[in-house]
Curated annotation (Swiss-Prot):
<comment type="function">
    <text>Could be involved in insertion of integral membrane proteins into the membrane.</text>
</comment>
<keyword id="KW-0997">Cell inner membrane</keyword>
<protein>
    <recommendedName>
        <fullName>Putative membrane protein insertion efficiency factor</fullName>
    </recommendedName>
</protein>
<comment type="similarity">
    <text>Belongs to the UPF0161 family.</text>
</comment>
<keyword id="KW-1003">Cell membrane</keyword>
<dbReference type="Pfam" id="PF01809">
    <property type="entry name" value="YidD"/>
</dbReference>
<dbReference type="InterPro" id="IPR002696">
    <property type="entry name" value="Membr_insert_effic_factor_YidD"/>
</dbReference>
<keyword id="KW-0472">Membrane</keyword>
<dbReference type="GO" id="GO:0005886">
    <property type="term" value="C:plasma membrane"/>
</dbReference>
Length: 82
């Protein structure tokens, strides 16, 4: 668990750098709720690095001006096999 949290730090820092230093200077254009950066943070924390990056990449590829979608798109729940 500790190792998982440590490995997430660089990704969380990059996302926060974007959110607080870059995003305020560009127009808001995310077509989804939660925003793509919020989605990325939640995906990484919920699913870990590999699946979190996969989900984030898929989300970023869907979020563009030509997308016909404009809606609530939460991070999928983590499946617990039991």
């Amino acid at each position: 668990m500790f190792f998982k949290k440590i490995t997430l730090i660089p990704f969380v820092m990059l996302i926060n750098l974007y959110r607080y230093c870059i995003s305020p200077f560009i127009p808001a254009r995310c077509r989804y709720y939660p925003t793509c950066s919020e989605y990325a943070l939640e995906a990484l924390k919920t699913h870990g690095i590999l699946k979190g990056l996969y989900l984030t990449t898929r989300r970023l590829l869907r979020c563009h001006p030509l997308s016909k979608r404009d809606y609530y798109d939460p991070v999928p729940c983590k499946n617990k096999k039991g």
